[in-house]
Every structure is written in structure tokens, then in C-alpha cells.
Amino acid sequence: VLEACKQLEKEGFEVTYLKVDAHGLVNFADLLHYIKCDTILISIMTANNEIGTIQHMQAIAETAKEKGIIFHTDAVQAVGSISFNVDAMGIDAMSISSHKIYGPKGAGCLFVRDGVKIQSIISGGKQERGIRGGTQNVPAIVGFGKAIEVAVRDMSINNKKIKSLKEYFVKRLTESIDDIYI
């Protein structure tokens, strides 16, 4: 998303980058402060792959909706790790990538809620509702579908294993290093 924002700036759009707190959460007061009457999009990373932060998506989505702003989330790091429902959370657009759940590289998914208008990214045809021209990579799409199926099926087991590893890691660190803060 950062590179897309940089490109938008080159095209003349004003982009505001919000800071996060020590836990990696977007400061909601800052978000409200920086929303302007001409703000058209809020894009927030659902989950941070480095520190494990999961944003408060529903509150951000509700604010965006109240102000008539499209809400996009980059859920690449979240898919297969947390359960979420785009309708319940009020998400207007969401991007995910196959390779993060052991699917084929080069396949991705962009959810766009009905009624949200977006500009074509690759001209030349009516594929993908006119958003992208060209022939779809059917084997990669099928592989992505299977990867999602497996990720959802195994999510609970994988999360339990990760939690156990985290607890072991924290225990070993706290036993080995005096005055450690985790």
C-alpha cells in the first residue's frame, strides 16, 4: 500500500501517513484529526506481520462510512491468521495475496464492495468487471482458492501452535534475561 500511496502523491493526490503507537495501533484521535472534507480513502493494514498488531477495523470502518469515505484494508498479513467478515466489519475494499498463505506467487484478490467505483488498472478488456484487461491466470486462481481453503481449515490449529511457541519463547527470555520488557 505504501508504494501505491507514493504513486498517488506523484499523480497529485495529498496522502497523509498516520503514526502508530508503541503497540502498532493507529491512533484513532489522529485519524479523526486528519480526515478532511475532501478525504476520499482511508487505507489501513489489517495486521502487522512484524509485531502482530491487529487494528480496530470496525471502528475505523464505521468512521469512514459516517464521513462518506471509502475504507480499504490491506489484509495480506491477516488472511489465514484471523477471522474477519467484510460485511460485519464494514470494509469497502480489501486486498489479499496468495503467496502469504503458501499459494501461487502472482495471484491476489481485491474485494470491492458493490457501489464502490474504482478505475481500471490495466486497460484492454472487460475482465474483472472492466477493472483489469487480459487473460486471467486460471491455475494460479485455483491454487489461491485451495490455499485459502487450507488456511481457513487449519487456522485454529496453526494459531494454537503459534501461541504455544510464543509462550515458550517469552518464558525462556524472561528466565534468561534480567529486567527484560516484552
Enumerate the language-model features and the residues they cover:
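Pyridoxal 5′-phosphate
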Residues: 1-182
